[in-house]
């Protein structure tokens, strides 16, 4: 090489890397052969657009590629404010131009992804700032059958959080994400229990048009809501005849009127209310002379009709139902919801059919789980699916807990235990310690809704199978799968 060439490839590359490290763009430009007019602006914009805080460069050894050309491989790392260290590598090419060693600059010298018109950009994207999780802080189980309820809750926590993506693209091609910082998400705990919710969901696998609601009686927290009801029905809001599960409330009214659980009553297959139609037991079964507790266990329609029309007025039944949540305001669960409703019976005939959960009596599956929880705890509490503060923010203050008649509640506990021990829920595969009440409700078109409500320790529940058949045939197997799966 001619001795008249100024400097060397090593000297020029070292000066270039030193200036680049310092951010001395103008000195860098003097070392480049025919730098583009926007050389300084291009470097500055690249750093500004990507929020580069600093750069570290590690040049390799100079490699000769000819008598008047050389190259220097290098690695580096840019620190981006959103991502931290972002490593890159490249090659600095040099050649003798005008008897001086110069840098042959190209866009890929700045960053290899800029070759062939490529671009690198920092993109912002929004994501939810809040994720609804179980009471334990875990993700809601997949296929939980609570998805529609969670989707309804999410707008109540509609804050957004910003995420960042570092993207590169070639002309005409889709951008590729190089690095991502997901939006920061805070966890909003629901009251749903992971294990209880999972058990409820799996119990409904393969079951159409059904729901399971589980509540913690001591607090009113909703532990599970698994809803496969069809036709946009909601287990929180829509009303259905509760059938014989309503006998829990009729029994409470009769107990408060003075009827003792041990009192002997008649349970004929059929009973005709004077000047009204005959009322029949399921399957027209007769149990003869039994205790009132066993009439409840056997779900004797005839007993309940006879005792209700002889001991209660329509107002008595309505007032008792009101104590148990019927006819009240919407429930401040965090998702709203209803309990039950009934019209004041107009005479003995309407009182008769209302007494076993037909006629004007309707309830939501949530309501009947609430009733079961009240038997276990002795207190009627409004269920909630969120923290007290969150539920109140969304729905307003919840009604205060109401303590129920201690004597009636104590008797109902024994009577619901008898249902499982030797009544309509006996030998159904339920785990030990379950108390409950079956229900079969007449529905349109001669069909039947199946119900089973109950509790075990500090867990109360309702199982509802719409148009599925009797409580024993449709709801009990689902309840057994649910409770055995917890």
Model feature map: region roles:
Residues 236-245, 331-397:
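Active-site-proximal helix/loop microenvironment
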Residues 241-292, 298-301, 313, 324-328, ...:
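Short, glycine/proline-biased beta-turn/loop segments that scaffold the active-site neighborhood
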């Amino acid at each position: 090489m001619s001795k008249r060439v100024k400097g060397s490839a090593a000297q020029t590359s070292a000066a270039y890397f030193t200036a680049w490290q310092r951010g001395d763009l103008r000195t860098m430009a003097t070392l480049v052969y025919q730098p583009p007019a926007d050389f300084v602006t291009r470097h500055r914009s690249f750093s500004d657009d990507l929020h580069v805080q600093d750069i570290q460069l590690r040049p390799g050894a100079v490699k000769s590629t000819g008598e008047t050309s050389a190259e220097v491989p290098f690695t580096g790392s840019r620190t981006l404010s959103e991502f931290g260290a972002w490593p890159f590598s490249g090659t600095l090419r040099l050649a003798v131009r005008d008897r001086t060693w110069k840098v042959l600059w190209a866009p890929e010298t700045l960053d290899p992804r800029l070759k062939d018109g490529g671009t690198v950009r920092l993109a912002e994207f929004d994501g939810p700032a809040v994720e609804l999780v179980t009471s334990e802080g875990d993700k809601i189980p997949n296929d939980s059958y609570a998805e529609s309820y969670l989707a309804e809750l999410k707008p109540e926590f509609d804050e957004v959080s910003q995420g960042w993506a570092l993207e590169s693209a070639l002309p005409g091609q889709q951008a590729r994400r190089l690095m991502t910082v997901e939006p920061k998400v805070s966890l909003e705990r629901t009251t749903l229990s992971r294990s209880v919710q999972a058990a409820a969901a799996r119990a409904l696998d393969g079951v159409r048009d059904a729901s399971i609601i589980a509540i913690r009686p001591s607090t009113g927290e909703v532990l599970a809501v698994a809803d496969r009801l069809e036709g946009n029905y909601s287990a929180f809001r829509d009303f259905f005849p509760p059938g014989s599960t309503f006998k829990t409330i009729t029994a409470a009214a009769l107990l408060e009127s003075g009827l003792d659980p041990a009192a002997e009553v008649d349970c004929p297959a059929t009973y005709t209310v004077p000047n009204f139609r005959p009322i029949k037991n399921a399957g027209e079964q007769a149990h003869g002379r039994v205790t009132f507790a066993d009439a409840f266990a056997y779900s004797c329609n005839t007993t309940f009709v006879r005792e209700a029309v002889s001991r209660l007025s329509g107002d008595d039944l309505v007032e008792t139902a009101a104590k148990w949540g019927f006819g009240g305001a919407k429930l401040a669960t965090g998702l709203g919801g209803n309990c039950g409703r009934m019209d004041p019976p107009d005479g003995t005939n309407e009182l008769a059919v209302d007494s076993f959960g037909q006629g004007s009596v309707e309830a939501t599956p949530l309501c009947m789980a609430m009733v079961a929880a009240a038997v276990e705890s002795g207190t009627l509490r409004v269920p909630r699916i969120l923290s007290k503060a969150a539920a109140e923010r969304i729905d307003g203050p919840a009604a205060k807990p109401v303590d129920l008649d201690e004597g009636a509640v104590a008797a109902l506990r024994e009577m619901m235990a008898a249902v499982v021990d030797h009544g309509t829920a006996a030998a159904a595969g339920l785990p030990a310690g379950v108390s409950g009440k079956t229900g079969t409700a007449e529905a349109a078109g001669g069909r039947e809704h199946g119900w089973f409500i109950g509790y075990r320790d500090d867990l109360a529940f309702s199982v509802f199978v719409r148009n599925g058949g009797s409580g024993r045939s449709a709801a009990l197997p689902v309840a057994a799968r649910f409770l055995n799966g917890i």
